[in-house]
């Protein structure tokens, strides 16, 4: 896929039929935030609330993410946020490999346009698609990886923290490391 301006990429994404997720979506959840952000957060895919509103991270997990951002002095409008897949998988299941492969060119294009210095992978699915297909979130989260001049880190997805609040301490350590890296840019 050739590098497209963000608006053209969005329009192409709206008309996408590259996988079966297009058959069940209410809305494409493209991404949002500052196009000039130094930091980009990438999640797995839209949930029910996101599919209904067409915006990323607006449900309970999004509310928790907002609090986590505020704790390191960031606001949603300061960052750019997107997902690996742009359409909701049925019953919030993990996206299938063919769905990820259909959508990943859109995300790569978004990353190229936003040109962040830091990418934060929220959860295992994002980390596997961006860092390493064998990524294990519990063993490998909180470490920095360098790719083409971009610092990449993975932490728990906010939905995982809602299911298992015991992981919040580790996520907080990750967010402090993110804040430190951002402050030193």
Identify the role of each PLM range.
Residues 1-185:
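A polyanion-binding, active-site-adjacent surface
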